[in-house]
Amino acid sequence: KKKADWLDWLLRIAIVLGIIGTFYFSYSPAKNYVTAKQEEAKIEEVSKKVVENTNDYPDVKEIKKSTNEDVVGWIRVPGTNIDEPILQTADNDYYLNHSLTKEELDVGSIFLDAKANSNYDNNFNFVFGHNTYIDNKFTQLRKFSDPEFNKANKTFYIFTDKHEKITYRIIGQGLIPPVFPLYTEDNVKLTVDNLTEYQKYLKEYTDITQESIEDIHVDSKLAILTTCLNYNNSTG
C-alpha cells in the first residue's frame, strides 16, 4: 500500500511538472513576441520623432545621445518595413539578442559589423539583422527574391550621425556560406592586385551582373545587408 501511495504521488508530481513545462514552453514564445512588439513600438516612437526633421533625415546624433550611444546610423529600405537604427559594438554577438535600449530580446537589433568604420567608408560594410517570426528587422529582404520587386526597388539609404544620407544602389543578392572571405578576412581592402579576386567572390555567390561587377573598383563602398534563410537558421 505504501509503495502504491508513493508511486501515486510520484506520478502526480510528474504530471504537475509536465503541465508546468508545457506552460513554460508555450508561454516563453508568447512572452518573446510581446517583448518584440513592445520594442517595435519603441522604434516606431523614435521614428515618429526623426521624420519631423528637415528632409526626413533621422537625427542619428540625437538618437545616439538620448537613446543609446551604440547607434551609428539609420537604415531605410523602400518597399519594405526596414526603417530603424543601426547599432555597433565591439562584440558582434551582443546585438544578436539585445534591443535598441539594451534589453534582452530574441529578435535582436540591426547592427554594423564590429570591424567596420562607423562612417561606412570600408570597401565592404556588413550590416546584420535577423530573419524574424514577427516580420521585422531584415525579414523583408526576402522580397528582393521577387524579380518584379527587385526591378522596382533599386536603392536603399543609410543616414549617419553627421547628418549625411548615403544612397546605395542595389546590385545583387545571393546565398553566401558561413565562411565567406569578404567577411572572415579582417578589414578587406580592395587594391589593384586583389580586385579581380574579390569581384570573382561576389559573382560566384550572388546574381550580380557582369556590368555591375565591372563597376566595382578600389574606391567602391559596398554595404552588404546580411540575414539568415529562416528564423533560427544560422547558416543562411
Feature names for model-found ranges:
Residues 18-236:
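Solvent-exposed, non-transmembrane regions of membrane-associated and secreted proteins
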